[in-house]
């Protein structure tokens, strides 16, 4: 089976592996790509990414839609058994182009961002309905998005499939030999509510010798420059981040509320590494954390709730945090491993192509 994959990011094509680049962002010669590498033999995956940085890509970023990528995919669509687009930025444009022709393979669109950020209004919604009037297949990583489609795009609901996100649990593993540094770690460069976390940490009178490391939002440093216990860092390479994860006593992933998928990679990687965690209960996280044995859930924007959760984690012994952290790993590996996601996606693709 020939699959054309159009991700909404740039894929680096490498002759040799580079550990500084995460798997979705790289394709190494002679190796399978991302979750497709677990597909059985007989599948060929070609990639058309969003392209290198240019003035035109800057324009696409402003209008929040990709143009060149879906046009390239449209031109070669009939060379493939299925086109899989990751993200509506190009998926909607590709689907719009295909709606005017008869000859086309089936189209599976990963809807990560709720089509247009899950906004419903008199301007965008009719345009989206028009673009999707031929009803492509849609994959989401949070179950509440299925309800969103039932309510606002009922004609598409039967073709929406919830498949949980998965991370590489053989790569993200506990590192018990790494010495702890009495730190709390949070990381992520987008869609984080670090203000709630920092405010909650600031209100704790007895910080028990803890420092909070915030990776990914250095611009907040001026706001909290009166607190030596909060350290802000820019985005760092993955190996360095994993070292900080291993050194931390526990991890916090503070999330704002949106009606789509975000933050899942971060908290599942943390759980796979055997870390106790505090995670905000949002549309994106509820499917994954409600039954997680080593996660304390906090409501969005709840500073007092975050403060109590931090104090609860701080008051645990190292042995207690290690125990619930390893329970998190068992939970994540049994439900949210990348291989399980790959199998579910492969089965769905076969169902689409073969009827």
Question: Regions from the language model: what does each represent?
Answer:
Residues 136-158:
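A short, active-site helix/loop in glycosyltransferases that binds the activated sugar's phosphate group
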Residues 312, 319-335, 344-347:
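A short, well-ordered alpha-helix in the C-terminal region of glycosyltransferases
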Residues 245-260, 275-276:
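Acidic donor-binding loop of glycosyltransferase active sites
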Residues 176-202, 213:
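Conserved donor-binding/catalytic core segment of Leloir-type glycosyltransferases
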